[in-house]
Amino acid sequence: MKAGWCAALVVALAGCGSIGPARMVQPAGLEARTVEVTIDGMGGGTRGSFQVAGNTGRYSRAASRLDLFDELLAFDKGGAEFTVRGPDFPEPVTARCGFRQTTSTIRIVEFTPKKFSYECSYEGLQGARFVLQEAAPVGGVSTLKAERRGEFMSSGRVYTVRSVHDAVGGIVPLAAPLGYVVDTAGTSIASVELNGLTPALRLPSSPASQGERRDVLLIALSLAVLWDPAAR
């Protein structure tokens, strides 16, 4: 299963030749009010160490797929864990995450009896929780996009997270998420790009609250460590 995710990354890189992976479209004005940092070390491996914005940590992850009756039924599941410490985390925070999804393919039509669902809990940050799920089709019309929507809750703050499928210069949206945008109070405050081997995060230049920068970092790490079956 590890090979499947690595292959997807190679395709993403190779498809763009020497110019690198496709960049996701950012919300209007977001680049002007954020600073870009990278999540180094959390590429395609199953475990290792990472660095982001002066913080460091270690991660591990796994994913599997069970096909029954020649893909009539397919069960995807996986889990991940990371611990981060540093200037934004005086007390280390450990995240434990897991996802599940069941799909069914009849001829060329794919159904999802159990839709994608991903959840993270956090030790060291009381009450924090992240839930990401497959989004309901707009207007009830299904598309090829594996759209995701979610919420991160921490100390009374609520952030909404939504997947982005449009690439800069692209003509049609991609099926798998290129990355995610983080919103709060109806305003986009951050984003994380996942296409390629080094996730790129846009952090708020002037966080609205003391914990906002920390929360955005946790959201980004929780997304970067996920092996989404849509990217298979």
PLM-predicted stretches and their roles:
Residues G17-R232:
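Intrinsically disordered, low-complexity proline/glycine-rich segments
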Residues K2-A8:
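Sec-dependent signal peptide recognition
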Residues L13-G15:
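C-terminal motif of bacterial Sec signal peptides marking the signal peptidase cleavage site
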